C-alpha cells in the first residue's frame, strides 16, 4: 500500500520514495519514505509508518474509546457503514475503529490502513499501520471509505475528504460536523455516516458536436 502514501506538506501530489532497511515475510519493518519535492522524510519502525508532524511525534496518542462490540461485530458494522462491497478496494480506519482492521479486511476482502491503532493491531498482507497527527498522508481520491472517531483532530476530516473517491463514504464523530460536500445518510448519538456524490458524466449522441 506504499503506492497510496503521500507527503503531508502542502505542494503538488507525488509518490514517496522508499528506502527499505529491514523486510520480513514481505513486510517492511524498518525504512524511510522520502518526498522528492520538499525532501521530508517519514520513518517506518516496527512496521508502522510515522507521518506525525514536527512537534507531534513525541506526544502520547489519545486514548481510544472502549469498543461497544466485539471485533467481528464491529467489522460487520464497518462493512455496512462504508458500503465495502468492492474486493481489493482500500479502507481507512482511525482510532478505535482500527482495532478491528484485520477482521474488516478479511470480512470485506479489502485493504485496510489502520491509523493510530492500539498495540494489539498488527500489520498483515492486507493491513498497513500509520501514525498521524493532523493529516492523512493519502493520494487524492484513492480510498473507498474512511472511518474516524473522537480521538482524531478536526483537521483530519479535510484530508479524509480529499482522499475519498466519488461515491465513497466517511464515518465521523458527532463532535465534528460532517463536511458540507457530503450527503449525510445516517447518524446516531455518537457518529454520522456521509457519502461523497458520484461524478456526473455528460452523455451526448454519437456524431454530434457542441
Task: Identify the meaning behind each predicted range.
Residues 1-64, 188, 201-210:
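N-terminal auxiliary segments of SAM/dcSAM-dependent transferases
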Residues 86-139:
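Class I SAM-dependent methyltransferase SAM/SAH-binding core
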Residues 95-99, 150-154, 176:
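Short beta->alpha connector loops
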Residues 88-92, 110-114, 143-149, 167-173:
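Hydrophobic beta-strand segments of well-ordered beta-sheets in folded domains
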Residues 154-170, 174-176:
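A short glycine-rich, Lys/Arg-flanked "PGG" loop and its adjoining helix->strand segment in the class I
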Residues 17, 51-52, 61-90, 96-107:
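Conserved alpha-helix/loop element of class I SAM-dependent methyltransferases that forms part
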Residues 87-89, 124-162, 206-209:
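A short acidic, Gly/Pro-enriched loop at the edge of an enzyme's catalytic core
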Residues 125-127, 171-192:
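Conserved class I S-adenosyl-L-methionine
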Amino acid at each position: 500500500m506504499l503506492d497510496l502514501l503521500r507527503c503531508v506538506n502542502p505542494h503538488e501530489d507525488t509518490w514517496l520514495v522508499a528506502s527499505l532497511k529491514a523486510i520480513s515475510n514481505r513486510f517492511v519493518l524498518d525504512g524511510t519514505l522520502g518526498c522528492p519535492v520538499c525532501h521530508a522524510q517519514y520513518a517506518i519502525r516496527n512496521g508502522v509508518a510515522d507521518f506525525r508532524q514536527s512537534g507531534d511525534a513525541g506526544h502520547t496518542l489519545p486514548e481510544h474509546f472502549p469498543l461497544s462490540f466485539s471485533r467481528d461485530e464491529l467489522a460487520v458494522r464497518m462493512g455496512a457503514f462504508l458500503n465495502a462491497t468492492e474486493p481489493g478496494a482500500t479502507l481507512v480506519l482511525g482510532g478505535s475503529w482500527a482495532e478491528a482492521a484485520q477482521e474488516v479486511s478479511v470480512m470485506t476482502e479489502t485493504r485496510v490502513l489502520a491509523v493510530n491503532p492500539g498495540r494489539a493491531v498488527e500489520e498483515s498482507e492486507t493491513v498497513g499501520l500509520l501514525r498521524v497527527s493532523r493529516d492523512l498522508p493519502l493520494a487524492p481520491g484513492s480510498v473507498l471509505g474512511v472511518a474516524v472517531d473522537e480521538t482524531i483532530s478536526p483537521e483530519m476530516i479535510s484530508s479524509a475528504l480529499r482522499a475519498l473517491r466519488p461515491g465513497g463514504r466517511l464515518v465521523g464523530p458527532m463532535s465534528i460536523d460532517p463536511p458540507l460536500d457530503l450527503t449525510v445518510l445516517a447518524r446516531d448519538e455518537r457518529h454520522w455516516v456521509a457519502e461523497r456524490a458520484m461524478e456526473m458524466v455528460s452523455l451526448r449522441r454519437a456524431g454530434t458536436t457542441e
